[in-house]
Amino acid sequence: HLRDGDYLPSTVADVAERFGRAIVMPNLAPPVTTVPQALAYRDQILLNRPPGSDFQPLMTLYLTDQTRPSDIIAAAQSPHVYGCKLYPAGATTNSDAGVGAIRALYPIFETMQQHQLPLLIHGEVTDPQIDIFDREQVFIDQYLIPIIATFPDLKIVFEHITTEDAARFVA
């Protein structure tokens, strides 16, 4: 999470000091939803690298209910976009534009699978009736297992898991 604005110079410097490359999260305000936006953000990151750094940002797109297969094809064709991030709407920082109906994105997942573009998932449900400690497991049961079954060749990264259930599932 490199963020943008006033935070970008310090976050890029910190990451570039420790790593040669990093997957860059697209949950800015507004979110990074297209390849041109990702490339513009990449340019800003590169401008903020410390002198002599060869840090390379690996860009991602933010999936929304408006994402089109053509957006995925463009991302797959870009040498700088490495995946697409799924945020359930309201699940985390700047996720208001996230996905409301995950199953409606199945055509997008199909295109991602065809073009070998990884799906990076912030995996939790946002239903206030579900205990916060059960939200990853419910996401796994309701969404992740069906996605894996429907798209067996789709590369998936289940990011920043926080529960033993999620760790067991990944293992």
Protein language model features and the residues they cover:
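Glycine-rich loop at the start of a catalytic domain that most often binds anionic cofactors/ligands
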Residues: 35-45
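Histidine/acidic residue-rich metal-binding segments in metalloenzymes
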Residues: 67-86, 92-171
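Di-metal (Zn2+ and/or Mg2+/Mn2+) metal-binding site signature of metallo-dependent hydrolases
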Residues: 1-11
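Short helix-capping segments at alpha-helix termini
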Residues: 46-54, 149-151
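Loop/helix-junction capping segments adjacent to catalytic residues or to phosphate/diphosphate-binding pockets
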Residues: 5-6, 31-35, 66, 164
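Divalent metal-dependent hydrolysis catalytic cores, especially in the metallo-beta-lactamase
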Residues: 11-37, 52-64, 80-94, 117-127, ...
